[in-house]
């Protein structure tokens, strides 16, 4: 995107002209926001990125506040806004909106969707097959938890769902200090009150480990930047202090997300300490790293051998990438804390598309992982040779990331016919 001081670019003007001339414009709307200079980053960009775009749309619909550069076919006769990503697939949007209209959900401003990997995105390469079959390397696919909704009246909003325009704007429109929130979905859902639904939104899987890591590290930095919301007092948009109304459960979510930044480092230190203590301790910690995913697949009824195989594979991948993740996660968390203190560059993030094809994560991991394990093996104990051999497997990671589009198999074809 260009960063002209006029607040728009030539490409945006041409896009608006195309929208005005298309015959299908009654089905599609377009808004182009003006850009302003961000005092935190020094760059010309839209106010508060995606969060600001939603707030600007809400204010236009509610109060006819128009600070857009260009708008095409935008009505003010809306009650709800549906939020999806470019790679999202949703088949029951009307039913999702109906959830918010139910009298029992009158206290909620947001209805959240459950995120799941798109079935046919697993055909891209070996990495997507492993990622999709296991529901992902991280806990993203398990965010939809009914226990907290039923017992604690608390749900998570991950950015895909539907919200009531008026209630959402009243509850969070002027609540947050500018240029401080990178990942806004969870914290907005927490303050606006979210109900999780049984409806699924399907998304494309990352097609390489580097793209997956770029997205995961942005999420991690966004979680750490929510650290101020653990305290009893917060700062609002105009800088005045206000009481933090988050529940203990919601604060626990924030704390656990921040704490998860140091899991890889803790496991790596435990692995090294166990190797010093003897082979029994080493293998115990190694098996512990593998155990939770594999046990979950074994205890699932009925037992799915394919799922069990994939659980073993990406549990092994977790160990292979452990040194890199310890370095990357800790570095990202510390960087976010430093930026919080300095109050600078808190809104900088690398998008999913911009990270496409990057090999920097793989290169760093190869150098750091293999060098560390080999050095320990030479200077200290031969048991570290096992670590060195394991970490050498990271050389195969780029092979999992090659773009090899496969044809849909017979199973996928049957699925298409039956849906």
Question: What is the role of each PLM region?
Answer:
Residues 1-244, 408, 414-419:
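Internal catalytic domains of large membrane-associated glycosyltransferases
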Residues 32, 85, 117, 198, ...:
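Active-site proximal loops enriched in glycine and acidic residues that flank catalytic Cys/His/Asp
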Residues 287-294, 381-404:
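Alpha-helical membrane-embedded segments
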Residues 301-305, 399-414:
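Transmembrane-cytosolic junction motif
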């Amino acid at each position: 995107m260009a960063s002209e001081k006029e607040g728009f670019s030539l490409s945006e003007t041409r896009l608006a002209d195309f929208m005005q001339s298309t015959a299908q414009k009654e089905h599609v709307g377009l808004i182009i926001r003006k850009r302003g200079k961000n005092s935190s980053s020094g760059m010309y960009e839209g106010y508060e990125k995606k969060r600001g775009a939603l707030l600007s749309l809400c204010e236009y619909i509610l109060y006819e506040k128009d600070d857009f550069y260009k708008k095409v076919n935008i009505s003010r006769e809306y009650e709800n806004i549906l939020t999806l990503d470019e790679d999202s697939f949703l088949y029951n949007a009307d039913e999702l909106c109906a959830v918010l209209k139910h009298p029992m959900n009158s206290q909620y401003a947001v209805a959240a969707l459950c995120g799941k990997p798109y079935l046919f995105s697993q055909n891209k390469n070996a990495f997507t097959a492993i990622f999709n079959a296991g529901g992902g390397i991280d806990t993203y696919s398990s965010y939809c938890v009914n226990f907290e909704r039923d017992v604690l009246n608390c749900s998570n909003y991950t950015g895909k769902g539907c919200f009531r325009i008026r209630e959402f704007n009243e509850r969070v429109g002027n609540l947050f200090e500018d240029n401080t929130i990178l990942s806004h979905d969870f914290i907005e859902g927490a303050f606006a009150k979210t109900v999780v639904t049984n409806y699924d939104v399907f998304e494309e899987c990352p097609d390489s480990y580097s793209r997956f890591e770029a997205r995961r590290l942005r999420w991690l930095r966004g979680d750490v930047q929510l650290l101020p919301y653990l305290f009893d007092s917060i700062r609002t948009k105009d800088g005045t202090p206000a009481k933090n109304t988050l529940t203990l459960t919601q604060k626990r979510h924030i704390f656990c997300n921040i704490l998860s930044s140091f899991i890889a480092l803790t496991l790596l230190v435990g692995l090294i300490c166990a190797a010093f203590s003897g082979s029994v301790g080493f293998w115990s910690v190694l098996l512990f790293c593998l155990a939770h995913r594999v046990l979950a697949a074994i205890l699932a009824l009925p037992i799915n051998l394919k799922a069990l195989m994939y659980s073993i594979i990406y549990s092994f991948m977790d160990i292979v990438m452990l040194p890199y993740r310890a370095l990357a996660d800790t570095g990202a968390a510390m960087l976010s804390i430093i930026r919080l203190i300095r109050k600078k560059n808190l809104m900088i993030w690398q998008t999913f598309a911009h990270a496409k094809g990057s090999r920097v994560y793989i290169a760093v991991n190869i150098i750091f992982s293999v060098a560390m394990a080999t050095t320990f093996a030479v200077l200290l104990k031969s048991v570290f040779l096992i670590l060195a051999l394991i970490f050498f497997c990271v050389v195969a990671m780029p092979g999992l990331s090659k773009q090899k589009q496969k044809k849909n198999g017979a199973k996928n074809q049957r699925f298409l016919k039956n849906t």
